Each structure stands twice: as structure tokens, then as C-alpha cells.
């Protein structure tokens, strides 16, 4: 068996095209154009790349994109003050603060300062809580994008044994909640997990988000499983690879996401979907 590739790049482009059409329809109806504020603190190269991609995608679908680039030395109070002003700005539907933040700024304080109706990253405890209670509104972007990828396979998720490897607030934990909502029997694995191999080998669906190249050997993948690889790791030779040993896993899986071109584009597409949702549901 050779796995079918889940083409995140193509699916994300399809979403962006639909969003662009909706923005055009809003303009023609005399409605306001959705606005996203993107805040970057410091000059971390990876963060600059991510932020650049988000701003470019915004412009592509016709959203208003406002950029706020702050110095690394920016105080926590300065950042919170900016968020307060964006919370009250009627032209802004979504506020995104690029993580990680410098050590002197507390991530959780910043996340909780963003109004839940403008939390298009889906990180606010209110929005995570809504997902936990099976009434999601603004959902965490990467897990939301992954669910779109899984749905694209046409596989019925109800009753699947799913394993999530990684328990971060950004991916692993909300991913577990998304899979529960989709009817999966879900196991979340982390650094204290025993018998990881045993759990992976019986999984119908595996989502891996640990940031370690080739962390999951391909031979662990159950024949016919769906493999979602969230990792994006650059090797010393410059090659980008995921957290799963791709070549071997692709021989066992029924569907697999490539790295790059799998999950990454979907995170940004989901961010754009959330921004339009916030405009339509909360701010029109």
C-alpha cells in the first residue's frame, strides 16, 4: 500500500479562493471588509517568516491587514495597552500576537487580554472551553485545519482509535478535543507516556506534533492508518522534514500529509476563516 497524499497546499488555496469570493460579496453588499491585526514582538527569524505569510494571505483574500512590529525590549504593559486599543477598534475583527514572546512577557496574560470575540488564534481559555463543551466558535487554527484535512479524505472518524503525540496548548490539547468531538476514541501522548510504540501501532489515526525530526518510526504506523504530521524541522543540510519517518510511513498509511505542504498552509487558511467568522458572527 502506498498512501494517498493529503495536499494541504491545494486545500488551503481552495479555502482562500472561497474566502476571497465572500469578501467580494461583502463589498458589493456595502458591508465592511474584515480586518486582522498582526502583532510581532522582536526579530525572531522564524516568527518573521510566519507573520509575513499571514499578512500576505490576508491581502490575497482581500482582508485589511494591520501590522504592529514591536521591539524585543517592549514592556508587557506596552503590549497589553496595544491589545486594549485593538480590542476597541471597530475595524479590527481579529487580533493575532505571534508566539513565542520574549521571556519578560507572560504568554498567558497576553492571550487572556485579547477579547474572546477577536481571538482568531483560538487560544483564549473561553474559546478552548467552548470546544471542550462541544460548542466551538473560534477554534485553534492548527487543529481546525487538521480536521479540514481529515474530512477531505472522506473517512468516517466516528469510532476511530486516534493518537495525538504532543500535548501543547497550541496543538496537542485542542487537537484531542477536536478528535473527541469528531467521535474518535482519543489517546494523548506526551513526555511521560509509557509504551508509545504500542499505542501508535493500534491507532487508526495519528497526529504528531513534537518538533523532533523523524521521531515516529514509519514501521510503527498501522496499515491503513491516517497520518497527520504537524512537525516542520530543518536538518543540517537544509532539508525540511516532519516528526514522522515519511518514506516508510507512506508505505503503511492510507493517507498522509507531506512536509512541507501539509498542515502548515492549513493553519493560515483556518486563521483567515476565523477572521471572517468573527466579522460575520460578532461584529456585523
Curated annotation (Swiss-Prot):
Instruction: Give the GO biological process terms.
Output: L-histidine biosynthetic process; methionine biosynthetic process; purine nucleotide biosynthetic process; tetrahydrofolate interconversion
- Top-rank taxon of the source lineage equals Bacteria
Q: Name one GO molecular function term.
A: methenyltetrahydrofolate cyclohydrolase activity
Q: Does the keyword Phosphoprotein apply?
A: no
Name any GO cellular component annotation. Answer: cytosol
- Give the Enzyme Commission number: 1.5.1.5, 3.5.4.9
Pfam families, sorted:
THF_DHG_CYH (PF00763), THF_DHG_CYH_C (PF02882)
Entry's CDD domains?
NAD_bind_m-THF_DH_Cyclohyd
Known pathway? One-carbon metabolism; tetrahydrofolate interconversion
Q: Which InterPro entries match?
A: Aminoacid_DH-like_N_sf, NAD(P)-bd_dom_sf, THF_DH/CycHdrlase, THF_DH/CycHdrlase_cat_dom, THF_DH/CycHdrlase_CS, THF_DH/CycHdrlase_NAD-bd_dom
Question: So where does NADP(+) get bound?
Answer: 166-168, 232
What Gene3D superfamilies does this protein's entry cite? Leucine Dehydrogenase, chain A, domain 1, NAD(P)-binding Rossmann-like Domain
The residues the entry assigns to the signal sequence are none
What is the reaction catalyzed?
Answer: (6R)-5,10-methylene-5,6,7,8-tetrahydrofolate + NADP(+) = (6R)-5,10-methenyltetrahydrofolate + NADPH; (6R)-5,10-methenyltetrahydrofolate + H2O = (6R)-10-formyltetrahydrofolate + H(+)
The record's keywords, sorted A to Z, are:
Amino-acid biosynthesis, Histidine biosynthesis, Hydrolase, Methionine biosynthesis, Multifunctional enzyme, NADP, One-carbon metabolism, Oxidoreductase, Purine biosynthesis
Question: Which proteins does it associate with, and in what oligomeric form?
Answer: Homodimer.
HAMAP family under this entry? THF_DHG_CYH
Return the PANTHER family for the record. C-1-TETRAHYDROFOLATE SYNTHASE, CYTOPLASMIC, C-1-TETRAHYDROFOLATE SYNTHASE, CYTOPLASMIC-RELATED
Function according to Swiss-Prot or TrEMBL:
Catalyzes the oxidation of 5,10-methylenetetrahydrofolate to 5,10-methenyltetrahydrofolate and then the hydrolysis of 5,10-methenyltetrahydrofolate to 10-formyltetrahydrofolate.
Give the family from UniProt: Belongs to the tetrahydrofolate dehydrogenase/cyclohydrolase family.
What protein is this chain from?
Bifunctional protein FolD
Source species of the chain: Shewanella baltica (strain OS195)
Q: Which gene encodes it?
A: folD
